[in-house]
Amino acid sequence: MKIVILGGTGLIGRALEDKFSSEHEVECRDRSAFSSLEELLPHLKGSDLVIQLSGSIIAKRWTKKHLREVWSSRVDANNMLAKAISLLPNKPRVICASAVGYYPESDCENPLQEIDNEPGNGYLAKLSVAWEDAAKSISSDVIILRFGVVLSRKGGALKQLYLPYFCGFGGPIKD
């Protein structure tokens, strides 16, 4: 099986490559694959599965410029992926990332249920809705995974949280 991981140089993409590469042909591409349709299309040809994880890091200062980059690297990338896949004679299965930012805020007394499918109101919710709408335009059976904060010893948020907790500045972790 040929698996193409878009956003494959990130934390999750590298972990998936490690997992799948012993039994499958895996091609990992960074966001530069979305520089043009002509750049993206050759990577998708002959693929059985496309995992779309690409997107600019959110954990930076939220300037207008950065928020436009975050939006474009997700929504515009999924729109380009939809266009590219529509041009393929054999359509691969597609898995797309999204974020738990889709959901509205909730508390422990009124926990949110997956069946409560109404999005929140903030920037991340609006981004997630547009991101998922673009993903749904790829295929009627696209799989959308809503990720939260990913913790790993290999990078990501855990690496940034470690020092404050180690120094005693982290708050309690509880329900």
Residue ranges and their predicted role:
Residues 34-80:
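NAD(P)H-binding glycine-rich loop region in Rossmannoid oxidoreductase-like domains
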Residues 141-144, 148-175:
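NAD(P)-dependent short-chain dehydrogenase/reductase
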Residues 3-21:
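N-terminal Rossmann NAD(P)H-binding glycine-rich loop of SDR-like oxidoreductase domains
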Residues 109-126, 161-162, 166-171:
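Catalytic loop of short-chain dehydrogenase/reductase
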Residues 119-142:
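Active-site Tyr-X1-5-Lys
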Residues 25-32:
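Conserved glycine-rich Rossmann-like NAD(P)H-binding loop of the short-chain dehydrogenase/reductase
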Residues 6, 53-54, 94-100, 145-147:
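SDR active-site strand-loop-helix element
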